[in-house]
From Swiss-Prot:
Organism: Staphylococcus aureus (strain MSSA476)
Name of the protein described by the UniProt record: TelA-like protein SAS1347
Superkingdom of the source species: Bacteria
Family label: Belongs to the TelA family.
Annotated InterPro entries: Toxic_anion-R_TelA (IPR008863)
PANTHER family: TELA-LIKE PROTEIN SAOUHSC_01408
Length: 378
């Protein structure tokens, strides 16, 4: 799996506000683009002096979105349990270890029959076990591929969440700068005007206007602080999203390594082990065949010697006895006579069977004719 490029990008730090103290942040206008400054001016105009209700609503939409985003993040973390993935990988390791190539070693039998029977039994047994485990590994591979697909989708979803968080961060930064800009404007322009007017006027309401403006500025400052807290949450959320992504990425890479490397390597090693076992058994069988051949040659030589002696002894005996020839001739004549009788009986039985077959054929034809006539009448 190609590493997501965004993993290499850290969350943007404070591009607009340089001071580390949230409550004493100052505007850095030189870092704003022209488009951003226009957005700040537009947002700043949304703050109407002495409009407490409007001030309370200022930036609240962003904070609500942040709240919804936090719930979405929580749901994402709670609903994605990586436990089954670890269990599947552990199951895979267990299956791969269940067939050990060392188990393919067999004892050297002393007899040819034992060699062939044991070798065949051992190979078939191991091959059967390997096929069974291979089928289980294939099923586990399908599960791992599903897990990998889910992890990939989760990584893409987290990228979307990361982009949303980045947008919240940027929007909150602009709102904070706009609020600070409005605060400075009120402190440097509006409040001095009201103070000067109150000093020159005898109307007590002008003094109250000054107090109201001061309280509004204080509330605006508190509102800025609240937005800064929300912005800090967005800033802290970025690395949390990346950590979750990194875990998913590591698991996806582990799954890919298992599917593309570990499993094929295991199958190759098992194939090699079986081949070596067959070679070892073939060598042992060839050795046994050679030994058996030598034993047979020796035994045949002994048998040939014995046969030669017995044959020579028999050759020294006289010609066949006359009684034996008479008995043999009588048996031949009786055999011929019995054969002729059997042939005669066979011809008679065949003739009888032929007549019976003709009668059966005639009966069948008559029966079929009757059936055909009955069908026509129906």
């Amino acid at each position: 799996m190609t590493e997501n490029k965004s993993f290499k990008e850290s969350h943007p730090l404070d591009d607009f506000i340089s001071d580390k103290e949230l409550s004493n942040t100052t505007i850095q206008k030189e870092k704003l683009t022209i488009e951003q400054q226009k957005q700040v001016d537009t947002i700043s105009k949304q703050i109407n002096p002495l409009d407490n209700e409007g001030l309370l609503a200022f930036g609240s939409d962003l904070q609500k979105q942040m709240s919804q985003f936090s719930h979405q993040m929580l749901d994402e973390v709670q609903s994605k349990d990586v436990g089954p993935i670890g269990d599947t990988l552990s199951d895979l390791i267990s299956k791969l270890k269940s067939v050990n190539p060392n188990e393919l070693n067999t004892d050297k039998p002393s007899m040819l029959k034992r060699i062939f029977s044991r070798a065949k039994s051992s190979i078939n047994e191991i091959f059967s076990r390997m096929q069974s485990v291979s089928a289980q590994v294939d099923r586990i591979t399908i599960q791992l591929q599903k897990h990998q697909t889910h992890l990939t989708r989760d990584i893409e979803l987290l990228d979307t969440l990361y982009d949303k968080n980045k947008q919240y961060f940027d929007d909150l930064s602009l709102h904070i700068i706009a609020a600070q800009q409005k605060k400075l404007q009120l402190e440097n322009e509006k409040l001095p005007q009201l103070q000067q007017q109150a000093q020159q006027s005898t109307n007590q309401m002008d003094i109250q206007h000054v107090a109201d403006m001061q309280q509004f500025i204080d509330r605006l400052d508190k509102r800025i602080y609240d937005l800064q807290l929300s912005r800090q949450i967005a800033l802290q959320t970025a690395p949390q999203i990346r950590m979750i992504q990194n875990v998913n990425q590591a698991l996806a890479e582990k799954i890919q390594s298992s599917i593309l490397t570990s499993i094929p390597l295991w199958k190759n090693q098992m194939a090699i082990a079986l081949t070596l076992m067959r070679q070892r058994n073939a060598v042992a069988a060839q050795r046994a065949v050679t030994d058996t051949t030598n034993d047979l040659l020796t035994a045949n030589a002994e048998m040939l010697k014995q046969n030669a002696i017995e044959t020579a002894t028999e050759n020294e005996r006289g010609i066949v006895d006359l009684d034996t020839l008479k008995r043999t001739q009588r048996n031949i004549i009786e055999t011929i006579e019995e054969t002729l009788i059997i042939q005669q009986h066979g011809r008679e039985e065949r003739q009888l069977a032929e007549k019976e077959l003709q009668q059966l054929e005639q009966d069948l034809k008559s029966h079929l004719v009757n059936i055909k006539g009955t069908n026509k009448q129906s």
